[in-house]
Amino acid sequence: MCIRDSKYLVEHLYSPVRRGLMDEIDWNDRLIGIKGSRGVGKTTFLLDYAREHFGADNKECLYINLNHFYFTERTLVDFASEFRAKGGKVLLIDQVFKYSGWSKELRYCYDNFTDLKIIFSGSSVMRLKDENPDLSGKVVSYNLRGFSFREFFNLMSGNSFPAYTFGEILVDHQEIAKGICSVGKPMAYFQDYLHHGFYPFFLEKRNFSENLLKTMNMMLEVDVLYIKQIEQSYLPKLRKLLYLLATSAPCTPNVSQLSKDIETSRATVMNYIKYLADARLMNILYPVGESFPKKPSKVYMYNSNLMYPIRPMEVNMPVSYTHLTLPTT
């Protein structure tokens, strides 16, 4: 069943954008974790790797989802052992946190199946090394983010502009801008990017706003409550906190008032804000030298797309243009 599922998914994969992270990863490592917020394309990224490095028919690489009912009675260790015995070399594991004891079994596979490479995906809320000592010093983790404006612009305009380093932009920004604008008009796509360009699922033939709203709720219900083991009864408080922060962001949070609004302690409010940031729903900014559990100086939405489902009638994003001028020496 798993082999048929993997082959089908790789064969029918629609992935028009090759993510830059693909070239940043050292694929020689034997245990690789791909973290990212819900909706940024972690599953697609794993399948992209399979298609690019092995193809759909090569049984040396296999994609599995640990949220499958198959793994309610079959252990990951047993499955990996059998896969390896049949010639398997690379195991791509999705939804790893849905499997009880996943970190211990990954460590067992790492220690005992030295000819097997494991690449797994996980939520941005997960602390792979801090909260999973079994993996400390073994796993190499990377973060997959949503589309950059460059990726969105390339996709929508049919171009293939490369990424530039900050140093290259500082030194040669005028020529870079001229080269881009000579074949495309990036600002014609910018408002669309602010509205729906961060999450790759805007390409699906579904209502984007409804899909994003469902994704945000899943971030709260699964990525925060499930992973952080918070009781379901506290979900309304977490949802209300997100709404209060979103409708006032960017802001310096009044923790005392927020604790009254959601009827919980100041310490719990601070924890919730941290969890929202871990889930990539919010960004939190601290003064230099400070960090959690201190109160952040500013709280704002993680990306502009998230503002529209919460404040659809209030979002106003004027676009300003500023030319970068460097001081002469």
Give residue spans per PLM region.
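Conserved lysine of the Walker
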Residues: 42
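Interdomain motor-coupling "hinge/lid" segment immediately C-terminal to the ATP-binding subdomain
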Residues: 131-235
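Accessory nucleic acid-recognition modules appended to NTPase machines
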Residues: 211-324
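N-terminal pre-Walker A segment at the start of P-loop NTPase domains
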Residues: 4-21
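Hydrophobic positions on the alpha1 helix immediately C-terminal to the Walker A/P-loop
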Residues: 45
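Conserved small/polar residues in nucleotide/adenosyl-binding loops
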Residues: 1-5, 322-328
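Hydrophobic anchor at the beta1->P-loop junction of P-loop NTPases
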Residues: 34
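Short glycine-rich substrate-engagement loop in P-loop NTPases that contacts/grips substrate
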Residues: 62-86
